[in-house]
Amino acid sequence: MRNRHFNLRHIAMLCLLAIVAVAPLNAQPQYPTSEHQYNDDIHTFIIKRLRQTTQQREKQMNKQVQQMLINLPNAEKLYDETFVRINTSVVEDTTEEGKPEINYVFDISYNCHHFEGTEDDYPSAAYQWNTSNSCRAICNLTRTMIDEELGDIFTAGHKTTITITSTTDAAEITHIDYKGEYGDFRYMPAVFNDENVRISVDTKEGITTNAQLAYLRARGVRAFLEEKVNALKQTENEYLYVTRCFDMTGPHYRRSSLKIVVHGAFDAAARNMEAALLNDEYVDFNIPSIEENSNSKTYALIIADEEYTAPLPNCDYASNDGDVLHEYFVHTLGIPTRHVKVLHNAGRQEIYNEGIHWLKDIIKAQNGDVHIIIYYAGHGICNPKFAPYLMPSGIDVSTIRAFKSKNGVLPSGIELKGNDAEKVLAQCISFDTLTGWFKKVSALSYTFIIDASFNGVQRSGKEFFNIKKETKRYRAPRVRDDIVIFMAATGDKTAYSFIDQHHGFFTYYILKELKFSRGEITFQELFNNVTKNQAYESSLQGKLQEPTMIIGGQLGDNWGNRTFINN
């Protein structure tokens, strides 16, 4: 059995022993005492993190794909029931020398839910990639994704295995002219109908079998990749051809699809993550625990809105923010599991019906003897008067002309006004609305944590969109006396993502403080530490971010003594 772990495992155990040796006698161990368990935990975390990154990018690519297909020229459009899909994965394997490697797999194909048309698939005797609308789309989408979205994976020197699958129907072939576009072939290895074969084809003899026709369709895709995809010109590529002749006739049996494996794509990243784990740099790993259900008066609503409808971009890592914060609420702050509700990709109505209404019922049932926490990670926007609004998932901008895009990417320079601005804001949640929902119910405390930008910039630092302003300066909203709001940034500044940590910067540093204080930290200490550490790290990355707070008018300095643990 091969070793599934990485080379630093013995160093890891030495570090573990050193930590245990110097730890106070009453402290909980920070790591498992078993080397095997410790290595398993690290390995599991690394693979999970890599898959998380891959899945996030896959979602964004598929959003872009659908938008690009919509904007194809009429002559190249696919049927409404033809669906192109990119699937990506992280796969552990071994090299020919028996060494472990962590590979990236890019798979693009399409499904057809109709059988009456011929334009999407190859004409009966055709083999060139551009004679099939579906093959043309797959080739061009592959080029766009590899060259524009996956440049950090398809890097110089990496080995790839490119499997091209091409098929024919059962129509009998007597003779098809071959023009020699891809050269003459003698005894070339391929798989045909699940058997290893050797295929020959040249201009003199032409095409006389379905095996030859399917093979040339695959060679056509290869010719496109070699000529058009720049990233593949710097990798070491091995091509495999899988061909098939179906036993029925029809255009939907004449197809091509593509799978690319980038060998060792994540090996370096895995080593870097392992080193960081040894230094306890990840808040998602080794989450501390206190007595279960000890914080029984606290209830929390977590809103993690990561996925948005195209052409709006997703909010990077918002889902992970919500999931990990849930772990800290339950394990580190001792909030009972049933007291925490997580909403993923929730729209305005769902947030109210499933979240706010749930909290209001609890407050009434407990006669206000509860502490309320509401967390939001997602997009935000300011109205013409700079009032901040949360922008939930599911927001529909399809009827707004400014959002029309040819390549699936959000157009730059969008500034909405008038009816278009009103259409967007009507689907959002203003701070006044959010806090006003609790106007008729009183709790011991309300704490809001908002990790969002309101200035027209995404977490990634890329341009989002804006609403034309009627005033020149941002002014923080006023809230009632029992409310404290932690904000990742003021309404005219950007809340960024911390890419290496898979979190928003603000959320990451809140989690870090909860981790190393084990939840025993006041709001004042939390805010001071987050401000200092976040400003330092974000400035090193060239994207300075400073959090802010909004405090109820009559709280004065008393807010600073609040904590998340309320026994």
Task: Label the predicted regions.
Residues I102-W129, V201-T203, A300-P311, P336-R338:
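Acidic/histidine-rich, surface-exposed loop or edge segments in extracytoplasmic proteins
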Residues E119-N130, I176-T209, M391-E422:
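A solvent-exposed, charged loop/short amphipathic helix patch at secondary-structure junctions
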Residues G98-P100, T155-H158, E172-N286:
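Periplasmic OmpA/Pal-like peptidoglycan-binding modules at the C-termini of bacterial envelope proteins
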Residues R2-A12:
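Bacterial N-terminal signal peptides that target proteins for export
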Residues A12-A21:
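Bacterial N-terminal signal peptides
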Residues P29-Y31, N272-N567:
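Cysteine endopeptidase catalytic domains of the caspase/legumain-like
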